[in-house]
Structures are given as structure tokens and as C-alpha cells.
UniProtKB/Swiss-Prot annotation:
Entry keywords, A to Z: Acyltransferase, Antibiotic resistance, Plasmid, Transferase
One Gene Ontology term of the molecular function aspect: aminoglycoside 3-N-acetyltransferase activity
Family: Belongs to the antibiotic N-acetyltransferase family.
InterPro entries, A to Z: Amioglycoside_AcTrfase, Antibiotic_NAT-like
Pfam families on file: Antibiotic_NAT
EC nos: 2.3.1.81
Name of protein: Aminoglycoside N(3)-acetyltransferase IV
Function: Resistance to antibiotics containing the 2-deoxy-streptamine ring including gentamicin, kanamycin, tobramycin, neomycin and apramycin.
Enzyme class, broadest EC rank: transferase
Reaction(s) catalysed by this chain's protein: a 2-deoxystreptamine antibiotic + acetyl-CoA = an N(3)-acetyl-2-deoxystreptamine antibiotic + CoA + H(+)
BP GO terms, sorted: response to antibiotic
């Protein structure tokens, strides 16, 4: 039977990893990798908030993934692939949540500034919660997940003006009516986001260590973006899969593939 980590131990691990008290922390997590621990997902959230302290702001992804249904920040559950920690977080008292389908949730002094922008299109554009974390010089914690879950790399793609996109849509309520909104998203399988692991480690920009039973990575958002922009400046298609018949392919989460020559 695996050891059950106590919250006090998790707080120590987070601080040893380099979480900044009073800072902004964007967390992508897999509770399955972290567990078992005292008080389950809630215990992990409490440990994260304790490590940040009262002056810190905790941020998590909180979108529903339901393209054909309007988003309600008070009731819409998160898409299952974001995990139980994210789905627990937005339901807690004093947690603020974006009022659009590409929502993030946040708690702390900077929460309103991070989540209050209107619908960002594409979702991780320079007017998105991910971008606000970047502007506030926040950190990104990948807790039991890899860079394929790192939404800050999508921000870097858009800042680099990558020449690819996938047709997407979402549904909003406008004057009491359902309205479909179409847009292009820099969405793909994200497998090659794993390249960022080596880039950041080579520059000693990525801190690594255990949190609970999980392997954790901690990086400044600005370091992620600056490093990715440097690589995308040399090869705008570096996050796409290698050429197949002279073309670079986006392996997408949907049946749609968009090809870039």
C-alpha cells in the first residue's frame, strides 16, 4: 500500500521545488499521479494555497469542452481530461471563474485580473487567462503531467504567429439566444510540446522534484514563452510532426487535420 502524504509534507515539497509565496501559480495536474494524500484532491488544493500564502494566487484550467452548449461558470463541470483537482477547485468558496467557454478558475488577490477578460479567440491568445499569468510573471506547475498539458506553449505559438490552425466553434448566449462562434485554433496533439522539456532543462530554467507521488516541473511562464519563441523563430512548424510526403501534419484531437506546406 502506498504511503499517504500529509498536507504539511506537500507544502514542504512545493516550497522546496521553488513555488514562490505571494506569487501567481498556474497548475496543470494529474491527481492519479499524486495520490494517495491526506484529504484527497481538496488536500492538494489546500497545500497549494498554503504554499502560496495569503498573498498568492492559484490558477487552474476550468473549461467545459462542450462546443455546442453555452458555458455557465456556476454550473458547468470541467472537461474530464482536466482532472478531478481542477473540477474540485472551481466549486470552492471564493474561487472566481471565467464567464466564457475557455474558462480558467483562480483564487487569490490577482484572481479577478486573471479571469475577467471576455471570450478570448483563440482560447490562449494574448487576451486570455494564460496570458495574464504570463504578464504577472507567474509560475507554471506541471504536476504529474508533461508539457503536452502546458497551455502556455499555445500562448507562445500565437505570439509567434504560427502558420497553422484548425476550424473550431463554441456556443454562447447572446440576448437570450444560442449563437455559434467559429474561429481558428492552434490546436494539435501537443506531443511535440515535449521538446520544451529539453530546451528548458538545457537553460536550467526548469525545476524538478517530487510532489506527493508525482514528478513535478516548475517553470516561470515568461521563461516558457521566451524559450518557445526562440525555437519557433527558427522553425515555426517545430511543434508539428515531421514531414510526411513533404508536408508537416497537425495530429489533432478532432477528425480534422490541417496541413501546412
Amino acid at each position: 500500500m502506498q504511503y499517504e502524504w500529509r498536507k504539511a509534507e506537500l507544502i514542504g515539497q512545493l516550497l522546496n521545488l521553488g513555488v514562490t509565496p505571494g506569487g501567481v501559480l498556474l497548475v496543470h495536474s494529474s491527481f492519479r499521479s499524486v495520490r494517495p494524500l491526506e484529504d484527497g484532491p481538496l488536500g492538494l488544493i489546500e497545500a497549494l494555497r498554503a504554499a502560496l500564502g495569503p498573498g498568492g494566487t492559484l490558477v487552474m484550467p476550468s473549461w467545459s469542452g462542450l462546443d455546442d452548449e453555452p458555458f455557465d461558470p456556476a454550473t458547468s463541470p470541467v472537461t474530464p481530461d482536466l482532472g478531478v483537482v481542477s473540477d474540485t477547485f472551481w466549486r470552492l468558496p471564493n474561487v472566481k471563474r471565467s464567464a466564457h467557454p475557455f474558462a480558467f478558475a483562480a483564487a487569490g488577490p490577482q484572481a479577478e485580473q486573471i479571469i475577467s477578460d471576455p471570450l478570448p479567440l483563440p482560447p490562449h491568445s494574448p487576451a486570455s487567462p494564460v496570458a495574464r499569468v504570463h504578464e504577472l510573471d507567474g509560475q507554471v506547475l506541471l504536476l504529474g503531467v508533461g508539457h503536452d498539458a502546458n497551455t502556455t506553449l499555445h500562448l507562445a505559438e500565437l505570439m509567434a504567429k504560427v502558420p497553422y490552425g484548425v476550424p473550431r466553434h463554441c456556443t454562447i448566449l447572446q440576448d437570450g439566444k444560442l449563437v455559434r462562434v467559429d474561429y481558428l485554433e492552434n490546436d494539435h496533439c501537443c506531443e511535440r510540446f515535449a521538446l520544451a522539456d529539453r530546451w528548458l532543462k538545457e537553460k536550467s530554467l526548469q525545476k524538478e522534484g517530487p510532489v506527493g507521488h508525482a514528478f513535478a516541473r516548475l517553470i516561470r511562464s515568461r521563461d516558457i514563452v521566451a524559450t518557445a519563441l526562440g525555437q519557433l523563430g527558427r522553425d515555426p512548424l517545430i511543434f508539428l510532426h515531421p514531414p510526411e510526403g513533404g508536408m508537416r501534419r497537425m495530429r489533432c484531437r478532432s477528425p480534422v487535420d490541417w496541413l501546412s506546406s
